[in-house]
């Protein structure tokens, strides 16, 4: 990136300069235009008919779960299918009771169940119980190892078992060397056998090797799993039909929400007022669908997407346009949190600052109506913290200062934005988002630090080359290379190891007993999953290429054929 001379008219309060040198990033424009502004509502009669079908099918699934009360493996398979098809939220109580029953009888009481000597069944049992927070031991896999402690060679012929064990290993916590070995073993052998497998198992293996289920977005994974599940003769027709109908009903809701947000975003005219910033409303909404897609979180989505667009624009003001003096003024204005600070800002900054206050005032009114006004203190404090972090990074960039890796991370974990986004994600979640829950979050527990680490490390690994080309602050990669005298490849390897540990910390943080209600923990896990998906190969939020467009289209454009 080159510093570009920008006419002073863009900042009319600095009349003593003829031109200002600015670090323009030349971000690509939105690829969507006004694609999502207009939404044609479905015929009410048709929607009502679909909703009736959904209710009937839900009752059928409930009956099937209840009928399998003494058949743990059958229950596990039904639960797994509901989760993979994206409809588990309809059966939270039933699934909770079923898994509790299975845990007590098969683990606490050590009662054998059908398939307890089968790798695929045991791995499924382990994964589903771990996903639900149960501290089941990985010692259950000892029976599949030989006298020397290696996994038996005979397992190489069990592709389904290897796949299920591979998926289970991604729920490991620190100290579980057996699962570390299992991951290496299964990954190696699945890569060897995948070309010899038939559809749909071959497709399942390829997909899992690219995107493990535990790190994927449930809504996105459901789109992929529909065709896989349908291809198996053993699929449950009621489950499949329910999932497709429910997907389309939810898609209509999401499109309606996005249309509303698109009109709001267009009315702000940020694309014109901040042409240097990323215009990413649609990508932001996709991000938020990864945090929660369920209908009961509609208000929460509307809150967080507005704040998300604000912080994305602020990030780019600090990162790709503002001068150091201008940024100091904006930082002070955020700390004061007062409309009276507007007059102290450069002209181009005023629409952003005013919009931030307007968005927060709108949220504050909603919180007041709910009797939850206390939440706004946390939301404002997090905004102040992240803007302070942006300011620190801007100073480093201006001074061409390369901090130590530890100094860098002390700021970069904040600017990764994941404590900020987690805080905002709690605002619309109802009574479970108590003052105690926010205090817990602000105590910076290990799970939130791990989530921040994943966000920061993956961002740096995928975007540092583009950012260094445009004169960005030194990324974690550069800081690590300089401090430890290693190559870029070695730095990436160290970052990968840190990512592995961070995911284990997240898994540990999701185990019982829960420090806060489980749905609040799930927001942290879900936000981390979004990073794994969007930054898996490169920064698809900034550079919206075909893979990202296809993902968005699958959730927000293309309906399921029922």
UniProtKB/Swiss-Prot annotation:
InterPro entries: Isoprenoid_synthase_dom_sf, Terpene_cyclase-like_1_C, Terpene_cyclase_plant_C1, Terpene_synth_N, Terpene_synth_N_sf, Terpene_synthase-like, Terpene_synthase_metal-bd, Terpenoid_cyclase/PrenylTrfase. The keyword Ribosomal protein does not apply. Mg(2+) 1 binds at residues 315, 319. Mg(2+) 3 binds at residue 467. Keywords: Lyase, Magnesium, Manganese, Metal-binding. GO terms for molecular function: magnesium ion binding; terpene synthase activity. Its cofactor is Mg(2+); Mn(2+). Binds 3 Mg(2+) or Mn(2+) ions per subunit. Mg(2+) 2 binds at residues 315, 319. Gene3D superfamilies: Farnesyl Diphosphate Synthase, Terpene synthase, N-terminal domain. A motif (DDXXD motif) lies at residues 315-319. The keyword Manganese applies. Catalyzes the formation of beta-elemol, guaiol and bulnesol. Belongs to the terpene synthase family. Tpsa subfamily. This is Sesquiterpene synthase. It comes from Santalum spicatum.
């Amino acid at each position: 990136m080159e510093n570009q001379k920008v006419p002073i008219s863009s900042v009319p309060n600095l009349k003593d300069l003829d031109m200002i040198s600015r670090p323009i990033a030349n971000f690509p424009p939105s690829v969507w235009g006004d694609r999502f502004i207009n939404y044609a509502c479905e015929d009410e009669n048709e929607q009502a008919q679909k909703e009736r079908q959904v209710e009937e099918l839900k009752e059928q699934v409930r009956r099937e779960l209840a009928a399998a009360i003494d058949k743990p493996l059958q229950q596990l398979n039904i639960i797994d299918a509901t989760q993979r098809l994206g409809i588990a939220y309809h059966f939270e109580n039933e699934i909770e009771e079923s898994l509790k029953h299975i845990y007590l009888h098969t683990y606490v009481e050590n009662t054998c169940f059908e398939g307890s000597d089968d790798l695929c069944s045991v791995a499924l049992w382990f994964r589903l119980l771990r996903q639900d927070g149960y501290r089941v031991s990985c010692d259950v896999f000892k029976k599949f190892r030989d006298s020397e402690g290696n996994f038996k060679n005979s397992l190489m012929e069990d592709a389904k078992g290897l796949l299920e064990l591979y998926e289970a290993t991604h729920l490991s916590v620190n100290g579980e060397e057996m699962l570390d070995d299992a991951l290496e073993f299964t990954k190696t052998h699945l890569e060897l056998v995948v070309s010899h497998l038939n559809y749909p198992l071959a497709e399942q293996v390829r997909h899992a090797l690219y995107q493990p289920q535990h790190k994927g977005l449930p809504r996105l994974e459901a789109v992929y799993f529909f065709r896989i599940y349908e291809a198996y003769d053993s699929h449950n027709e009621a489950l499949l039909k329910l999932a497709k109908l429910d997907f389309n009903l939810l898609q209509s809701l999401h499109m309606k929400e996005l249309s509303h947000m698109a009109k709001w975003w267009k009315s702000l005219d940020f694309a014109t007022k901040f042409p240097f910033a990323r215009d990413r409303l649609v990508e932001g909404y996709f991000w938020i669908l990864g945090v929660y897609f369920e209908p009961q979180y509609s208000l929460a989505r509307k809150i967080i997407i507005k704040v998300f667009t604000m912080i994305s624009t602020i990030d780019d003001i600090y990162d790709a346009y503002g001068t150091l003096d201008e940024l100091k003024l904006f930082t002070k204005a955020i700390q004061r949190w007062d409309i009276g600070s507007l007059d102290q800002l450069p002209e181009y900054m005023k629409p952003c600052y005013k919009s931030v206050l307007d968005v927060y005032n709108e949220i504050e009114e909603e919180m007041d109506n709910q009797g939850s006004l206390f939440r706004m203190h946390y939301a404002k404090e997090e905004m102040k913290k992240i803007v302070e972090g942006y300011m620190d990074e801007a100073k480093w960039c201006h001074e061409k200062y390369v901090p130590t890796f530890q100094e860098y991370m002390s700021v970069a974990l904040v600017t990764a934005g994941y404590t900020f986004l987690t805080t905002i994600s709690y605002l619309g979640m109802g009574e479970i988002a108590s003052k105690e829950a926010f205090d817990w979050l602000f105590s910076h527990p290990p799970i939130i630090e791990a989530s921040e680490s994943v966000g920061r490390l993956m961002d740096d690994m995928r975007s540092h080359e583009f950012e260094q080309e445009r004169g960005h602050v030194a990324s974690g990669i550069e800081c690590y290379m300089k401090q430890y005298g290693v190559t870029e490849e070695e730095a990436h390897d160290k970052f990968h190891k840190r990512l592995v540990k961070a995911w284990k910390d997240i898994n540990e943080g999701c185990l019982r007993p829960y420090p806060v209600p489980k749905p609040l923990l799930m927001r942290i896990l879900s936000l981390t999953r979004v990073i794994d998906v969007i930054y898996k190969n490169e920064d698809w939020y900034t550079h919206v290429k075909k893979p990202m467009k296809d993902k968005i289209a699958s959730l927000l454009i293309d309906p399921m054929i029922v």
